[in-house]
Amino acid sequence: MFKATARYIRVQPRKARLAAGLMRNLSVTEAQQQLSFSQLKAGRCLKKVLDSAVANAELHDNVKREKLNVIEVRVDAGPVYKRAKSKSRGGRSPILKRTSHLTVIVGEKER
């Protein structure tokens, strides 16, 4: 099993989990196709992490891309950056800029 992570990505975890659902339990080539047609920002980020995990597998263990399968996709919430927007009469309302930690684990297919 080979793992790749991306941390502190400026994508809301709730939206990133939607994109992660597209690639669960697929082969690596199918998952890359699914993510390349996704219009979500999280899809682009997950595709980069998936490519990194595949590169780790090819570099460290000489595993062929065709034999790899997406074993686990995890989207965890990162820190929340708090900003404020000015409102009328001296008030303010909070703006929460959420971040995500993306983890993709790939491995060889079960026979």
UniProtKB/Swiss-Prot annotation:
**This protein's GO CC annotations:** cytosolic large ribosomal subunit
Which purpose does this protein serve, as stated in its record?
Answer: This protein binds specifically to 23S rRNA; its binding is stimulated by other ribosomal proteins, e.g. L4, L17, and L20. It is important during the early stages of 50S assembly. It makes multiple contacts with different domains of the 23S rRNA in the assembled 50S subunit and ribosome. The globular domain of the protein is located near the polypeptide exit tunnel on the outside of the subunit, while an extended beta-hairpin is found that lines the wall of the exit tunnel in the center of the 70S ribosome.
Q: Tell me its family.
A: Belongs to the universal ribosomal protein uL22 family.
The annotated subunit structure for this chain is: Part of the 50S ribosomal subunit.
* PANTHER family, per database record: CHLOROPLAST 50S RIBOSOMAL PROTEIN L22-RELATED, LARGE RIBOSOMAL SUBUNIT PROTEIN UL22M
Listed InterPro entries: Ribosomal_uL22, Ribosomal_uL22_bac/chlpt-type, Ribosomal_uL22_bac/org-type, Ribosomal_uL22_sf
Q: Which NCBIfam families match?
A: rplV_bact
Task: Kindly provide the name given to this protein in its UniProt entry.
Answer: Large ribosomal subunit protein uL22
Q: State the organism's lineage.
A: Bacteria, Pseudomonadati, Chlamydiota, Chlamydiia, Chlamydiales
Question: Which keywords describe this protein according to UniProt?
Answer: Ribonucleoprotein, Ribosomal protein, RNA-binding, rRNA-binding
Any one Gene Ontology MF annotation carried by this entry is: rRNA binding
The superkingdom listed in its UniProt entry is: Bacteria
A GO biological process of this protein is:
translation
